[in-house]
Amino acid sequence: MLTDEYRYKILNVLQQDPNISQRELAKRLGVSLGKTNFCLRSLIEKGLIKAENFKNNSNKVKYLYLLTPKGIEEKISLTQCFLKRKLKEHEELEKEIERLRKEVSDTK
């Protein structure tokens, strides 16, 4: 299953580096090549990315992964969700830090 986290990470990497290989993408994500292939196929089926063939310098056929307009909208939506979640985590962490500081100062 393709989680929001992986969907976000993949869309983000592909937007920055559309000619990345599946092997390099798998390495950046810290997942297997098979899982990366599965995720890319899923994103293509959902219309979030498209893959185009091109030849690189050594005459090997490679893919160029491009975000579709729908993919760009999805990335924006996911970014907003992650930002909201991270801000909440940040607030909770600040509260915990303050509680720990108070605990330490109370024991002195």
Where would I find each of the regions flagged by the language model?
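Amphipathic alpha-helical dimerization/coiled-coil segments
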Residues: E73-K108
